[in-house]
Amino acid sequence: MLSRSEGQQALEAASEIIGSKGVNRETLAHAYYLRGNAYRQNGNVRMALNSYLESMELDPDGPAAEAYRHIQELLDFYNKDYYNP
């Protein structure tokens, strides 16, 4: 697990790559995936899911698809009563 400062550094580095021009799709998809991981480790699940979705648009078979699925499964389990009153 990353420390808070390491997580912030990871977010900044990934966001810098995402904001750069001329980055290839594979690198961009990986940057979104890494940013999603940093958000998740910082407790910001919503932003993590958004970053994973961005990555999946660029690389549907990349690691973000599995990370997204895992978070969704956890949320479904955690919110089971919300969906099944």
Residue ranges and their predicted role:
Residues E6, Q72-P85:
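Alpha-helical linker/edge segments of TPR/alpha-solenoid repeat scaffolds
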